[in-house]
Amino acid sequence: MESLDDIVREIMSCRKCDLHKTKTNYVPGVGNEKAEIVFVGEAPGRDEDLKGEPFVGAAGKLLTEMLASIGLRREDVYITNVLKCRPPNNRDPTPEEVEKCGDYLVRQLEAIRPNVIVCLGRFAAQFIFNLFDLEFTTISRVKGKVYEVERWGKKVKVIAIYHPAAVLYRPQLREEYESDFKKIGELCGKKQPTLFDYL
């Protein structure tokens, strides 16, 4: 089986599309290579491009906070994107870019073989749902629902939620977002810390 390190090395010298010409850093992914849960976003933004790590800006801060709310740290999970390079001006990925770069994500998932895959936002959900032959309509329709697929000789849970950037942009989604993370915590056998956990 291919190792995650081998895939990351290949990403770091990728020339499959023109995004490598405009990026500052490749952003392959970060976290635990034996993670039970993988979070998949759309593409690196400005902060991620500068640092070479996914979800390090304001959206990343919210993601880290939500992980902590269910007793997880970034080091416990694996975080990546469909695209490994930033599209100029944060424009939407093109179908060609998704097709060429998406292969890396498929191989990353194959190397990690998680029990839970969380799609952060519409692009990630479209890609993952397509990969697992699940019907995707809109993010608001599939959001928060748990789908079960057979993969790697086991049952894998797939859940789509809003991208953290959408929650920052629309604070009224926050309560719903927290509820979705509780559900993710339950899928991983985690619960929200209570006051008694700190006594």
Curated annotation (Swiss-Prot):
GO biological process, one term: DNA repair
Function in brief: Removes uracil bases that are present in DNA as a result of either deamination of cytosine or misincorporation of dUMP instead of dTMP. Can remove uracil from double-stranded DNA containing either a U/G or U/A base pair as well as from single-stranded DNA.
Record EC number: 3.2.2.27
Effect of residue 91 to A: Loss of the iron-sulfur cluster
NCBIfam families: Arch_udg, UDG_fam4
Binding positions ([4Fe-4S] cluster): 14, 17, 85, 101
Region (Pseudo-FCL): 77-114
Comment text on domains: Contains a pseudo-FCL region, a large solvent-exposed peptide region containing an alpha helix and loop anchored on each end via ligation of two cysteine thiolates to a [4Fe-4S](2+) cluster. This region is involved in DNA binding and catalysis, particularly in duplex DNA contexts.
Thermal dependence summary for this entry: Extremely thermostable, maintaining full activity after heating for 1.5 hour at 95 degrees Celsius. Exhibits a broad temperature optimum for activity around 80 degrees Celsius.
Activity regulation statement: Product-inhibited by both uracil and apurinic/apyrimidinic sites.
Impact noted for substituting residue 101 to A: Shows reduced uracil excision efficiency
Protein name in UniProt: Type-4 uracil-DNA glycosylase
Catalysed reactions, semicolon-separated: Hydrolyzes single-stranded DNA or mismatched double-stranded DNA and polynucleotides, releasing free uracil
MF terms in GO: 4 iron, 4 sulfur cluster binding; metal ion binding; uracil DNA N-glycosylase activity
Reported effect, residue 100 to A: Shows increased uracil excision efficiency
Cross-referenced Gene3D superfamilies: Uracil-DNA glycosylase-like domain
Family: Belongs to the uracil-DNA glycosylase (UDG) superfamily. Type 4 (UDGa) family.
Native source species: Archaeoglobus fulgidus (strain ATCC 49558 / DSM 4304 / JCM 9628 / NBRC 100126 / VC-16)
Nucleus recorded as keyword: no
Keywords: 4Fe-4S, DNA damage, DNA repair, Hydrolase, Iron, Iron-sulfur, Metal-binding
UniProt note: pH dependence: Optimum pH is around 6.2.
Superkingdom of the source species: Archaea
Name of encoding gene: afung
Positions bound to uracil: 41-43, 55, 81, 163
